[in-house]
Amino acid sequence: MSTDNKQSLPAITLAAIGVVYGDIGTSPLYTLRECLSGQFGFGVERDAVFGFLSLIFWLLIFVVSIKYLTFVMRADNAGEGGILTLMSLAGRNTSARTTSMLVIMGLIGGSFFYGEVVITPAISVMSAIEGLEIVAPQLDTWIVPLSIIVLTLLFMIQKHGTAMVGKLFAPIMLTWFLILAGLGLRSIIANPEVLHALNPMWAVHFFLEYKTVSFIALGAVVLSITGGEVLYADMGHFGKFSIRLAWFTVVLPSLTLNYFGQGALLLKNPEAIKNPFFLLAPDWALIPLLIIAALATVIASQAVISGVFSLTRQAVRLGYLSPMRIIHTSEMESGQIYIPFVNWMLYVAVVIVIVSFEHSSNLAAAYGIAVTGTMVLTSILSTTVARQNWHWNKYFVALILIAFLCVDIPLFTANLDKLLSGGWLPLSLGTVMFIVMTTWKSERFRLLRRMHEHGNSLEAMIASLEKSPPVRVPGTAVYMSRAINVIPFALMHNLKHNKVLHERVILLTLRTEDAPYVHNVRRVQIEQLSPTFWRVVASYGWRETPNVEEVFHRCGLEGLSCRMMETSFFMSHESLILGKRPWYLRLRGKLYLLLQRNALRAPDQFEIPPNRVIELGTQVEI
């Protein structure tokens, strides 16, 4: 490691604490309270407290430390992570049928994220604001309005970017974790007996004593590890080493101390179960703690919102969601983006959730199903990568998968008990997103196949035009083409109706590669097809936004001079009608038509000046 890297490591690690660990770092606000609140039939008693603490600690070790930080984070695509990245990696060296199954798993995992993300900001901010019940019980009626006000301000600042306030995230979250550790240590010193719960036998004893009830209670324990998937998704921003270093040096010790501190408090004062986190603090510290807790939950919510923006952009670029307006809020950091439609849809959903559920305890009942479902899918996809891409021994990989599923499946099954009490919400939202993504992908493929099934050979058409050219007019024409070897619809219709062709014709294809970024050296490939025809293929990664002006600049560097304001861009505009279909495919077709009508137009996607665009319409039956 270079000196520069050594000097920057503390800064990167601090930044990772500020962004990556917001969700899991605010879990102590509500996790132990939900475990011991009485909903599972046992109260605050020694065996239950020790059992839950042991389960929480060893889940943090096994799921976060071993599974995600040690194993899953090995699977990266040019340093990037996330469930869709894992899906892409897993499908590289498998058969077509297996790849299809892996794609479905990846899309379900991505859809689950959309379902869970509606709950995370609501439960985080509400659990912090609920500290008012301890500070000033008469203000408890203000919890819902204040939660909505805080989140409204958060969603409103998204369009301005978070670069400025983002600099404060790291020191605030570091302060938060130090407070977690300090409060917990203070309580543990007063009752060190609680440290016996570090022994995993207490978790075993918990299952043996409480039997079926203990299994159902796993639905509350899982609240302690929500946010684990974010570690993998944010790997590209901070790097594996920084995320691991932050976890083992700051986050894990702080969480452990705080959970065990809450346990020590409950052993001495069972009545503290109404809010064990805030009751850890002395009276004089309650208001400052309430403020820092609110800030920490806002930061956790911001991390989730940014994650939704990133996942949406990746899904759009990979062709699973319709094109939509994506705004870059930072000239320095390509990952800082703002998607207005997603932002305000998420805001409306979060407000509805807060008003409907009214208390974080009610929201906890809806939390966990999507998280644990994603955990199961991550285990399957990551072990597939280990076998197919890393060529690990199949028996060793099978043992790893069995070990992961022995934890993931019980957690997921236990959370199914929440289905009627709120778990239906993330599942419903996830199902809607899965239908939307699969509909857009499959119907888009159907449309392209329909448009080009009777197409002639591109090479034959160019040869014919060069041999018997139509009237040529001065200038350059660019025809956008979705596929490399097919004749653009706009070109055929221009020849059919206008019977003219520009002196120079460029067939431009913008391609998304299976990588987050494409090096500038490989950005543009130029091929001269004839004296007057050129093919330009511009490649972009799924974390990049295509820009035609940049493509023209690259073409100029390679000898094909193009000027944006002297070029005409011909594009086809399809008017779609539904053909004869079974009723269920007809419903899917209607959904696709709705998505198509609201999709961002190509000139806006690629930042082409509107006065240089000529759209030629055609009717296509799908």
Curated annotation (Swiss-Prot):
- Print the keywords alphabetically: Cell inner membrane, Cell membrane, Ion transport, Membrane, Potassium, Potassium transport, Symport, Transmembrane, Transmembrane helix, Transport
| GO cellular component term of the entry, any | plasma membrane
**What is its subcellular localisation?**
Cell inner membrane
Topological category with respect to the lipid bilayer:
Multi-pass membrane protein
Q: InterPro entries this protein is in?
A: K+_transporter (IPR003855), K_trans_C (IPR053952), K_trans_N (IPR053951), Kup (IPR023051)
Q: Which GO terms describe its molecular function?
A: potassium ion transmembrane transporter activity; symporter activity
Pfam families assigned to the protein according to its UniProt record, in alphabetical order: K_trans, K_trans_C
Membrane-spanning parts: 9-29, 49-69, 103-123, 137-157, 165-185, 213-233, 247-267, 276-296, 337-357, 363-383, 396-416, 419-439
Name the catalysed reactions: K(+)(in) + H(+)(in) = K(+)(out) + H(+)(out)
Q: To which protein family does this belong?
A: Belongs to the HAK/KUP transporter (TC 2.A.72) family.
Q: Which HAMAP family match?
A: Kup
**Which NCBIfam families does the record cross-reference, listed alphabetically?**
kup, PRK10745.1
Job description of the protein: Responsible for the low-affinity transport of potassium into the cell. Likely operates as a K(+):H(+) symporter.
Under what name is this protein listed?
A: Low affinity potassium transport system protein Kup
